[in-house]
Amino acid sequence: MTLAIKDGATEIDIVMPLGSMLEGDYETVVDEIQQQKEACGEHDMKVILETGMLQTAKNIKIASLLSMYAGADYIKTSTGKEKPAATPEAAYVMCQAIKEYYDETGIMIGFKPAGGLNTVMDALIYYTIVKEVLGEKWLTNKYLRLGTSRLANLLLSEVIGEEVKFF
């Protein structure tokens, strides 16, 4: 992480310590995330929850809240390597947790669904969840990011009306 920051990284992604989370060792989860945030300094840190491995809405909510209280600037559904990756259900739970955190602290936390966003409709689903649960002030690139490598070309193709292979 230190090397990435020295090389110019302005944001850092970390994966939540899933073993500790699934064992109910929340103190270790918070300690590890806080240590990583300390190493990030002023740089934004995204905590990846791997929601597919968390399996339940309860676990996803707990993981979301622990991450935010430990210093996450964003919470992210997944790396995209595990299946399932992002799901609308997980996104809804995460956005509810962000709203709860915001209502308690006044701090806006970003949200990033990643993995499995393959169509314009997928993007619209996540956009709508964020808009309905969190409100329009979250609909900026500061607070909503879509993690996808294919979607940019699909969106450009939709807008232009012909196939684009820019990215």
Model-inferred region functions:
Residues 1-111, 118-149, 157-167:
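Alpha/beta enzyme core
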